[in-house]
Amino acid sequence: MKDKYLRETRMVDFSNPAIQKLIQNMKWKEMGEFERIKAIYNYVRDDVLFGYNIDDGISASKVLADGYGQYNTKGTLFMALLRACNIPCRVHGFTIDKRLQKGAMTGFVYRNAPKSIFHSWVEINFENQWYELEAFILDKTYIKKLQEQNSECTGAFCGYGVAVKDFRNLIIEFDRNNTYIQSEGINQDFGVYDCPDELLREHHQEISAFKAFAYRHIGRHLMNRNVRKIRER
């Protein structure tokens, strides 16, 4: 069973020299399994900043080179680092309501975005149990600034890349538990897949060629600017 959750793929390209160098420098393989998972999780969450890449189908090494990512792309990098360090993992596909992106998406970008946005999280097998990990998507600096800028919110929150029931008490640290940050926005479940390559072969963002071009060359840059503004306030 474990072999299929540890294999390398085009997207989960953990033999890439940059990924191998990172693993060596961080000394993750020298840690116990629990500490290794936590360290990789924290790295992907906080050192790879929240932002929008050119495409969901880019490789883990490209995400690392970009230095930023979102739910799908950061998940690909997370899986590559986990598998390279002998932690079995898989991907779970969904769509989410675009309302949770409002604020990161604004103006014509938000108005023209699909109502349902392709989404995924990573599931790890640790101590014979599967854990659902989603909260690596947003870096803690971004979350802290968002909480400061919405200090009046003490309950549910939806927007700026967040969809949760309790905005003040987020479950974003891994300690043998599931972690979530956008799960309250899920509106369709595609189930689990061995790797993102297989998930994307069956499901992907439904968008016209024109809108895809506009996203790559205009929309995502405006979205990244909005995210930076929040983080730097």
Task: Show which residues each predicted segment covers.
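Secondary-structure boundary elements
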Residues: 1-66
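His-Asp-centered catalytic microenvironments across diverse enzyme cores
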Residues: 7, 11-14, 96-233
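Glycine-centered secondary-structure boundary/capping sites
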Residues: 18, 22-27, 80, 145-146, ...
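Residue-level signal for well-ordered alpha-helical scaffold segments within enzymatic catalytic domains
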Residues: 42-43, 80, 84, 120, ...
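Active-site neighborhood of thiol-dependent amide/isopeptide-bond enzymes
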Residues: 52-117
